[in-house]
């Protein structure tokens, strides 16, 4: 699998850039501002979350090219 991978929670406004099997960035909009949270998966639940993101489990879906440009500029 090539990285980065991009996912979102369908209908919830949370967006993810997965850099590799142990790192991801979560982005959401709060009061009109992009809020960014970087996560390094060190514990098992975090590692499982990245696997769920990559496998598109639950409500995780791929982001469109327009969404990627909007939520992860630069």
Predicted regions and their residues:
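N-terminal helix-cap/turn-to-beta initiation motif at the start of protein domains
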Residues: 1-5
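Tryptophan-anchored aromatic micro-motifs
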Residues: 6-11
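Broad, structure-driven detector of short, well-ordered beta-strand segments within folded domains
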Residues: 14-20
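Basic/aromatic-rich interaction segments and small domains that mediate binding to polyanionic partners
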Residues: 24-36
